[in-house]
């Protein structure tokens, strides 16, 4: 059976709600043709569907499949987004996600999404000056920003400006066992 036949069977199985069977057919498709990016993408979305929380094994396998997709087709921004979200939201791989988004920037230099995602990660890590500088590059490079995102990005930029000007010792650092923020949390 050809890779395309397995892929079509995977689509049919998914449409019938037979997720495990769809996953098996998609895996057979990539076994027959390791460069079948649509089958790799199907594996990704079956293992980690939007709106669901995959376990760590599913998230890891979905990330492997997603990596195959972006290696085969670096212009697939949807795959970059999915991989980045898997790394941060499900696997806690913040530093790897920063590199992931930099690779996305290299593959799609006119996209604003990687800069916004890197900014968010840096901000989550408490690296406010770096996050501010990264977000500023969005404006310096004159990248296209959707009108729907402009207000959110402007608000984020103002927030980062204020945070970057604060004393870094006043920021909560959850990775530090004796940070004062833990005392405030325990008091609640």
Residue ranges of model-derived segments:
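Eukaryotic alpha-helical solenoid repeat scaffolds
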Residues: 123-188
